[in-house]
């Protein structure tokens, strides 16, 4: 059985990242063949500054290790180091209906909050589908807010398989810890770096 998931390095790691994702990664590394990555291409949709993105990417790698992910048990990698992610995303985009992306909660939520949309944000689910499908995982540990993106991944995989009349892609299942499915931020909304309501993971006692 294989597990795959990732985290954006769009800012300092916060407790929502830990309870919503990384804690699951650590628990699953003794049960599954694990692939966990730093989603630095996804981070470009909200944090395109090169130097800060590079710095944050390194920090998230160190945080993964500090919080218990063991490179002897799981494969850890950076999204941009594997060019096949974007190559597959382009291929998948040609079988992905526009309406499927227009219904994505993440896109609608961010635009409703006044975050200026771009094409990267709109096609985010297609790249996420490529991230997932190229590794044939059985489960995808995600926060509850990402559940729809895994469902979109399944829809894209089904469309691709039907288009080419072959079972090319496995249909992954999301894996969510319901007790911490969505960690609230300081304003009561979902904790998110793009909303500015996070509590950093490694804050001092002060």
Located regions from the model:
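Active-site cores that bind ATP or allylic diphosphates and position pyrophosphate for catalysis
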Residues: 108-206
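N-terminal Rossmann-like or analogous alpha/beta NTP/dinucleotide-binding catalytic cores
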Residues: 2-130
């Amino acid at each position: 059985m294989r597990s795959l998931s990732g985290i954006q390095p769009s800012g300092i790691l916060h407790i929502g990242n830990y309870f919503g994702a990384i804690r699951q990664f650590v628990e699953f590394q003794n049960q599954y063949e694990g692939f966990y990555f730093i989603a630095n291409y996804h981070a470009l949709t909200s944090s395109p500054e090169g130097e800060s993105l590079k710095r944050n990417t390194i920090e998230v790698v160190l945080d993964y290790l500090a919080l218990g992910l063991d490179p002897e048990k799981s494969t850890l990698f950076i999204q941009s180091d594997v060019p096949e992610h974007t190559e597959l995303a382009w291929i998948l985009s040609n079988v992905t209906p526009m309406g499927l992306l227009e219904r994505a909660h993440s896109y609608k939520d961010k635009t409703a909050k006044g975050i200026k949309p771009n094409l990267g944000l709109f096609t985010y689910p297609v790249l996420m589908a490529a991230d997932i499908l190229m590794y044939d995982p059985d489960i995808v540990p995600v926060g509850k807010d990402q559940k729809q993106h895994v469902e979109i991944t399944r829809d894209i995989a089904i469309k691709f398989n039907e288009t080419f009349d072959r079972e090319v892609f496995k249909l992954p299942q999301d894996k969510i810890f319901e007790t911490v499915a969505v960690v609230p931020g300081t304003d009561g909304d979902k904790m998110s770096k793009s909303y500015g309501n996070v509590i950093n993971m490694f804050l001092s006692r002060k």
